[in-house]
């Protein structure tokens, strides 16, 4: 056999549902890589003969390989910070009160409008590096802090550039309908017209987005406005997704599911009607424990219903300056278990297999098996559950992206 590299003395959490063992585990395993893809994988005792003199062999010292982590919901391209609002919230102000007073998203919009592409790129690069050190190999980045055509395009251009200059794959999402800008506060329908007629057209013309998202909520966009944006995006051939049921239940998840959305995100107030709609459409439910924690929310997502209806559960950081300034995917694994009562296996699936489905890349990443992209991490742990159990110690020892060792 002729391979580019071989890994031995490892255990593999493949996350492949076709393998019945927990985590799709193969113990005392080996994995071979050829031309950026997994060429062979299985028990080490069954490893075919290969040229050991010409093939790099890496020894995992009994650690665990997992698929590269996928953070399927971030807002990591932004300027400024909102530490002052953190103080206000702790003094009793609500997220809605801050937003209606011109704070929240709008304060970050001002900072992003003033920042240059170079400044935004450097800030984004630092944050992407932080995620990459924790084993993230694919990430989604949303716009939404421009709320005018020029700045929305600027944010998406920066996200695209990050993908070109970093080993982490970047999927971009246009979120022009993130909040109603001050200049349209008395005419939100006119802003929706701008999002559809001008912003989205420009985004498509420059090929800046893989998907389109909307914040469907009482403080943002109505169900009807949301459907207008998503329907237009779908007709243009873009994937669609939705911030839904975070603060109330407007029925956004059910509507998005009927349109074929890849995911609906937050969903603390999702009801059984919405869960059933997700199940029927194959739409993923993205859980964002960072925002739940940071905003000190008490309404839990309907985890048991999602299990009952077998809706794929995704776990993501929602990294952003206002409601989840927590740039750590490993922390989300722990929070997913401690706050939402996911099992460690469900949490890891939410950052691998299911996250890939939410981004539409499940044919290439998210599980480890022959033919898939060689994106994987070596962890200095004795069980995959340790990734969710403990936090703060660097256990990510190696990262392979597209068959290349990128972190050692």
From Swiss-Prot:
Cofactor: how bound: Binds 1 zinc or iron ion per subunit.
Gene Ontology annotations for the cellular component aspect, listed alphabetically: cytoplasm
Residues where 4-imidazolone-5-propanoate binds: 82, 145, 178, 246, 323
The keyword Iron is assigned to this record: yes
SUPFAM superfamilies reported in the protein's UniProt record: Composite domain of metallo-dependent hydrolases, Metallo-dependent hydrolases
GO molecular function: imidazolonepropionase activity; iron ion binding; zinc ion binding
Pathway: Amino-acid degradation; L-histidine degradation into L-glutamate; N-formimidoyl-L-glutamate from L-histidine: step 3/3
Reaction catalyzed: 4-imidazolone-5-propanoate + H2O = N-formimidoyl-L-glutamate
Enzyme class: hydrolase
UniProt EC number: 3.5.2.7
Main subcellular location: cytoplasm
Residues binding N-formimidoyl-L-glutamate, per UniProt: 145, 320, 322
Keyword Cytoplasm among record annotations: yes
Pfam family, one: Amidohydro_1
A biological-process GO annotation: L-histidine catabolic process to glutamate and formate
Cofactor(s), by name: Zn(2+); Fe(3+)
Location in or out of the cell: Cytoplasm
Keywords from the UniProt entry: Cytoplasm, Histidine metabolism, Hydrolase, Iron, Metal-binding, Zinc
Domain of life: Bacteria
Binding annotation for Fe(3+): 73, 75, 243, 318
Annotated positions binding Zn(2+): 73, 75, 243, 318
Membership in a protein family: Belongs to the metallo-dependent hydrolases superfamily. HutI family.
HAMAP family, per database record: HutI (MF_00372)
PANTHER family with a match to the protein in the record: IMIDAZOLONEPROPIONASE, IMIDAZOLONEPROPIONASE-RELATED
Its biological purpose: Catalyzes the hydrolytic cleavage of the carbon-nitrogen bond in imidazolone-5-propanoate to yield N-formimidoyl-L-glutamate. It is the third step in the universal histidine degradation pathway.
Name recorded for this polypeptide: Imidazolonepropionase
Organism: Shewanella loihica (strain ATCC BAA-1088 / PV-4)
Gene: hutI
């Amino acid at each position: 056999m002729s391979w580019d590299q071989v890994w031995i003395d490892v255990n593999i959490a493949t996350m492949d549902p076709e393998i019945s063992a927990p985590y799709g585990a193969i113990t005392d395993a080996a994995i071979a890589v050829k031309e950026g893809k997994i060429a062979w994988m299985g028990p080490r005792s069954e490893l075919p003969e290969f040229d050991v003199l010409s093939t790099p062999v890496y020894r995992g010292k009994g650690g665990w390989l997992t698929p590269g982590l996928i953070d399927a919901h971030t807002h990591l391209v932004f300027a400024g910070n909102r530490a002052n609002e953190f103080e206000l919230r702790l003094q009793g102000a609500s997220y809605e009160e801050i937003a209606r007073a011109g704070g929240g998203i709008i304060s970050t919009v001002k900072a992003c409008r003033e920042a240059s592409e170079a400044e935004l790129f450097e800030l984004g690069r630092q944050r992407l590096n932080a995620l990459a050190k924790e084993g993230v190999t694919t990430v989604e980045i949303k716009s939404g802090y421009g709320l005018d055509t020029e700045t929305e395009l600027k944010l998406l251009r920066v996200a695209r550039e990050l993908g070109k200059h970093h080993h982490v794959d970047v999927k971009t999402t246009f979120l022009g309908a993130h909040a109603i800008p001050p200049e349209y506060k008395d005419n939100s329908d006119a802003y929706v017209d701008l999002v559809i007629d001008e912003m989205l057209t420009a985004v498509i013309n420059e090929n800046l987005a893989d998907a389109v998202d909307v914040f469907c909520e009482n403080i943002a966009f109505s169900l009807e406005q949301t459907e207008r944006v998503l329907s237009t995006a779908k007709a243009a051939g873009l994937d669609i997704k939705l911030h839904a049921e975070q603060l109330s239940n407007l029925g956004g998840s059910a509507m998005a599911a009927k349109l074929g959305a890849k995911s609906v995100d937050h969903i603390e107030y999702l009801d059984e009607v919405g869960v059933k709609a997700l199940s029927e459409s194959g739409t993923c439910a993205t859980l964002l424990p960072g925002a739940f924690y940071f905003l000190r929310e008490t309404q839990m997502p309907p985890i048991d219903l999602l299990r009952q209806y077998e809706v794929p559960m995704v776990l993501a950081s929602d990294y952003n300056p206002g409601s989840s300034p927590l740039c750590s995917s490993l922390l989300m694994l722990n929070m997913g278990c401690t706050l939402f009562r996911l099992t460690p296996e469900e949490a890891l699936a939410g950052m691998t297999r299911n996250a890939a489905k939410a981004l539409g890349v499940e044919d290439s990443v998210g599980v480890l098996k022959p033919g898939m992209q060689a994106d994987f991490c070596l962890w200095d742990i004795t069980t995959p559950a340790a990734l969710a159990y403990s936090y703060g110690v660097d256990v990510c020892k190696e990262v392979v992206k597209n068959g290349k060792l990128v972190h050692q």
